[in-house]
């Protein structure tokens, strides 16, 4: 963590490794996305994937991706989706972009609100993932064990 006294040096040091960290987020997220795209009850919201509704726009304007993705999980049992998120061992709970750790968040319909671009179908639940810098095999294994809770 950075103190106010050394914040300039801290920011400078963190900026030096930003490109390396973002590349790792991207690489890890691509592996996780490939794993998750095998599940029929999960619709992956990640523009890097060719079957994403935003792939063409992403390809036109961007040269890389991030560690952020959304999962639209089809389940009649909301508690099982919450249990899925809560059983993730490597993931913290919360929002992030670019931090070192993987995070997960089960978004409620109230938080989504009236966003036209993010409509959930009946029995769909949104889980937001930030894929961190941990070993991608460990991240995938953690998600795999947590998926057993979905009903």
Question: Could you tell me what each predicted segment is?
Answer:
Residues 3, 61-63, 119-122:
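Solvent-exposed alpha-helices and their adjacent loops that cap or buttress functional pockets
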Residues 36-45:
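Short acidic amphipathic segments
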Residues 13-20, 67-75, 127-132:
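Short, well-ordered beta-strand elements within core beta-sheets of diverse protein domains
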Residues 44-107:
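Conserved PLP-binding catalytic core of the aspartate aminotransferase-like
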Residues 13-35, 62-66:
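Structural signature of PLP-dependent enzymes
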Residues 75-76, 87, 102-151:
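PLP-dependent enzyme catalytic core of the Aspartate aminotransferase-like
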Residues 1-11:
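Single conserved hydrophobic/aromatic residue that forms the stacking wall/gate
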């Amino acid at each position: 963590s950075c103190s106010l006294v050394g914040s300039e040096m801290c920011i400078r040091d963190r900026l030096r490794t930003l490109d390396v960290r973002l590349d790792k987020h991207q690489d890890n997220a691509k592996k996780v996305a490939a794993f998750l795209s095998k599940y029929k009850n999960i619709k992956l919201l990640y523009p890097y994937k060719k079957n994403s509704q935003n792939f063409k726009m992403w390809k036109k304007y961007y040269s890389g991706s991030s560690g952020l993705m959304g999962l639209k999980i089809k389940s009649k049992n909301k508690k099982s989706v919450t249990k899925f998120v809560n059983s993730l061992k490597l993931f913290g709970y919360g929002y992030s972009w670019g931090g070192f750790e993987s995070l997960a968040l089960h978004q409620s319909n109230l938080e989504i609100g009236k966003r036209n671009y993010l409509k959930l179908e009946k029995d769909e639940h949104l889980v937001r993932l930030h894929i961190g810098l941990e070993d991608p095999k460990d991240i995938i294994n953690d998600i795999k064990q947590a998926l057993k809770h979905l009903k």
